[in-house]
């Protein structure tokens, strides 16, 4: 079979103008970036609001079992399903996140799908796209630079600062600067560093750190903002530091919020692209699901729902991660409601979740992972059942998509389908979209159309008025199946301070490992009788949630010993090779 990049290059494409025209988008609301991608104006949403009689489309939320390093094919299934819906005559498009350069050059690779179910051109999708990540990185670091500059000048001028500048002293506490710097790259050396070293003119010496751009609060804000006015207001609320009295200093107080918003003006517009079968795709924002809220943007979803009958969107990692955050954060803030949930499962992924196989990086895969092994698969299906029950907890019908591989036996596929239905899925279908494109997802598409007609009633895990401590406990007990939380002394103090300051109404965004339903990546299948340690709690006032770190979570990844960049190169003809 051809490589992903070879398939991408051979796929027939519409010009971006023709693709937009097919969706009924006026030419003046499209800003082309090259031949096959373009920005869509937010005026599209205003036009839709002026036509109240128009019926909005139905949203399909794609999640998965607990992911493994092998990959379950969630993006392939998301794109394949959108193509499959078009294949059976149901107009559809997809909304997905923009890839981060960190994983592209690290281990995971790109995030454009794969095979015959991918966004094309895949190299443009995976590398820079329309520059949104760079704009966001610049806006984030502008705030960091402004904060350190203000600290420097207030320190240098002392009591004369106000008289010399006409500005009120912010009295920044250098030991309590909350806003890190950011970079869209895996770079472990930037997790802890000292800045301001050198002469007095080189700034105030202090400890600093970097997070990857996808983990920035600004990325969460971009994904959750409803329009430019909302984006500006959210950025103004960002808490950058504390003063010497322990009071927050915001981006508004630093007078940098307006300039940050200016840098993000174009990044607020979703990017229109297409799949290998010319199905439209809106690509926008890119928050990770393990260290952020893990869903594409509110604006892209709303725009797509006005343009077509079915919109397929993807929530990051398993249902305990991106799906939970979709409902308890994204839905809670935006009101966007899916009609059904699709859970992606693979035979090999469920075998890996059985806990019976020894799978280690750099070691040969166990023979039973790639050959028929019904007992191991049956044990691993407990993980599938847990995710089905977890998704149904939110009040929606669940369809299981079995992403099939050539190594799967008929007996294994039959067992998986049977277990899915017994666990409460309203439908289950085998998808071969990777090999066959939309035709390979047609049965899945029919099951999804049927599920979207079923009655549903959204149920969230906790009400707004519940305390932050109670929300954390509820999330662990009901969202992960654990016994409760273990708060560090630091987390205790932080939660008490947030409650006293009136932030109890916000939802919780837990940063934890995606490789287990629990906080421990070694606990496979369906862990029970565990308590989740919460090391630290942070307020994301602009994004509108409280961020809790469950254990030693890295918000700046590092490159592994065998990074993907080793295989990426470019020929004299300008064609990129080795990108996956």
Curated annotation (Swiss-Prot):
Substrates-to-products reaction catalysed: (6S)-5,6,7,8-tetrahydrofolate + formate + ATP = (6R)-10-formyltetrahydrofolate + ADP + phosphate
Keywords: ATP-binding, Ligase, Nucleotide-binding, One-carbon metabolism
Superkingdom in the source lineage: Bacteria
Coiled-coil segments: none
Top-rank EC class of the record's enzyme: ligase
Binding site for ATP: 68-75
SUPFAM superfamilies: P-loop containing nucleoside triphosphate hydrolases
Pathway annotation: One-carbon metabolism; tetrahydrofolate interconversion
EC number: 6.3.4.3
Keyword Nucleotide-binding: yes
InterPro entries, A to Z: Formate_THF_ligase, Formate_THF_ligase_CS, P-loop_NTPase
Swiss-Prot/TrEMBL GO biological process terms: tetrahydrofolate interconversion
One term of GO molecular function: ATP binding
Classification via Pfam families: FTHFS
Record has Metal-binding as a keyword: no
Protein family per UniProt: Belongs to the formate--tetrahydrofolate ligase family.
Protein name in UniProt: Formate--tetrahydrofolate ligase
Gene from which the chain derives: fhs
